[in-house]
Regions:
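Asparagine-centered polar/low-complexity signal
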Residues: 107, 148, 201, 232-240
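C-terminus-biased signal that marks the final domain/tail of proteins
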Residues: 1-87, 182-193, 207-211, 233-339
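Structured soluble/peripheral alpha/beta segments that form catalytic or ligand/cofactor-binding pockets
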Residues: 138-144, 150, 161, 184-193, ...
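Fold-independent oxyanion-binding glycine-rich loops
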Residues: 106-108, 137, 157-158, 207, ...
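A contiguous strand-loop segment
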Residues: 13, 28, 32-33, 50-171, ...
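Short acidic-glycine loop/turn motifs at beta-strand connectors
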Residues: 93-100, 148-150, 205-209, 216-219, ...
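Short, well-ordered beta-strand elements within core beta-sheets of diverse protein domains
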Residues: 175-179
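Short, surface-exposed beta-strand-loop junctions and turns on beta-sheet-rich folds
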Residues: 110-112, 160-162, 218-221, 323-327
């Protein structure tokens, strides 16, 4: 796992990160895109300029730092012409845990072999919030979840890979939220405003313990604030009105979603008030409950490539570098004031 710690203006962060990426050029960085996709990426660039403007300065710094084409980085980071991970995320408020601290949990579902490419990034852009976020492969702008110094934690799960047109992708929206917002309501407001690309389920919790589930789609976005102090998102929409927007969902994905929902609901009802990080780890390690899976293909094994647990009131992350059934969760310090 790579640990990246950078601060400064967005451009300076990009420049320093770009210099770190020079050695990756012999490994195929940046990936090649067709002229058509490079041209199409400009529409996504315009949307990010509108809603997350500083991040483009970071990309420009990266392009200069590693001497690669800026538009190739735009196509790689801002568009849907890329990897398609699914995920599982759940959150529990403080009153239902034994320690009295809220917990936020994520399984990143992609190729298990990609676990070696996990990167955690502690960044502090000038005038913004410091954050601790997770990405992989080549660590550029993207964050697939994380937590910031205000105690706001966010992640998400893709509900539909249908490309509905230029907008702000999950990985970019998550980064911008970590950089800028302190409360769940602020993050929700931002997600409501942005044009969506894929269908995404976001889950958010802040330091006050406010959980929001945001089922987001270009045609409609539905926000739920669970009264029970627990919620989860996974590989499809939960609400019937949002499911109508994904009419071609496979029976296998629907069944997995329902299995996960039923298991987590029963587990929460049984354990609430006594939940600990270890009790979460215990269920994450079990294959039969379908919180993770192993699907062997010619390309590799699809499943969980890493898992992590954070708390809005803690400066520690527990991370499993690989499928949790085969790997231990180890503690890592979250240091927002790094030198």
């Amino acid at each position: 796992m790579r640990h990246i710690k950078l601060r400064g203006t967005y451009y300076d962060i990009g420049l320093d990160n770009g210099r770190l990426l020079v050695s990756e050029k012999i490994k195929g960085f940046p990936p090649k895109f067709s002229e058509q996709n490079l041209e199409r990426s400009k529409a996504y660039e315009e949307e990010v300029q509108t809603y997350c403007p500083g991040l483009l300065d970071e990309l420009r710094g990266m392009a200069e730092g590693c001497e690669v084409d800026y538009q190739a980085l735009v196509a790689f980071e801002l568009t849907p012409f890329r990897l398609k991970p699914s995920c599982l995320v759940f959150a529990i408020v403080a009153e239902h845990t034994k320690s009295g601290k809220a917990l936020f949990v994520r399984n990143h579902e992609w190729m298990e072999e990609e676990a070696q490419y996990l990167a955690n990034c502690t960044v502090h852009p000038s005038g913004k919030l410091a954050s601790y976020g997770f990405t992989f492969l080549w660590p550029l702008l993207s964050r697939y979840g994380g937590i910031n110094e205000a105690g706001l934690a966010i992640s998400g799960a893709t509900a539909s890979f249908e490309n509905s047109g230029p907008g702000v992708m999950l990985n970019i929206a998550t980064r911008w939220i970590l950089d800028n917002f302190k409360t769940t309501d602020q993050a929700v407001e931002f997600i409501m405003e942005i044009p969506k690309v894929w269908g995404i389920n976001y889950l958010i919790i802040d330091k006050k313990g406010t959980i929001a589930k945001v089922e987001a789609h270009r045609q409609k976005t539905l926000v739920t604030y669970p009264a029970k102090g627990f919620d989860f998102v996974s590989i499809t929409y939960e609400s019937p009105e949002m499911q109508k927007l994904v009419p071609n969902e496979t029976p296998q994905r629907l069944q997995m979603f329902e299995t996960r929902k039923q298991f987590l609901s029963n587990w929460f009802q049984e354990k609430k008030g006594t939940i600990t990080e270890q009790s979460i780890i215990d269920i994450m390690k079990v294959c039969d409950n379908q919180l993770h899976y192993h699907e062997k293909t010619p390309e590799g094994t699809f499943g969980t490539c890493w898992s992590w647990i954070v708390s809005p009131t803690s400066k520690q992350a527990l991370i499993s570098l690989g499928p949790p059934c085969k790997n231990e969760f180890k503690p890592y310090e979250i240091d927002y004031k790094f030198s």
